[in-house]
């Protein structure tokens, strides 16, 4: 079921799955990340760690987007409001061939 919370996530090219997370837990999930509480916990810990690096005098988070890259896939993590959006995408980038 597509909701306003997830409708944009459904249309991302090469998307293998997604999570929508708040401090209270997983709000929505689909694909390879459906009901993946473990990955949600790991991602939230990474976000909390990155948020410790705030600049003095700013209320904004120190980042809005974070990518965790593996050989075959990428986790694209975006913070919007009080929610963390995680999309697992196929990694189509390959190292250039040097001839």
Curated annotation (Swiss-Prot):
What is any one GO biological process for this UniProt entry? positive regulation of TORC1 signaling
The entry's cellular-component GO terms read: lysosomal membrane; lysosome; Ragulator complex
Keyword Transmembrane attributed: no
Residue span of the signal peptide, if any? Answer: none
Record keywords, A-Z: Lysosome, Phosphoprotein
| Top-rank taxon, per record | Eukaryota
Q: Where in the cell is it found?
A: Lysosome
Q: Name the InterPro entries on file.
A: LAMTOR4
Subunit structure of this chain's protein: Part of the Ragulator complex composed of lamtor1, lamtor2, lamtor3, lamtor4 and lamtor5. The Ragulator complex interacts with slc38a9; the probable amino acid sensor. Component of the lysosomal folliculin complex (LFC).
Family classification:
Belongs to the LAMTOR4 family.
- What protein name does the entry list? Ragulator complex protein LAMTOR4
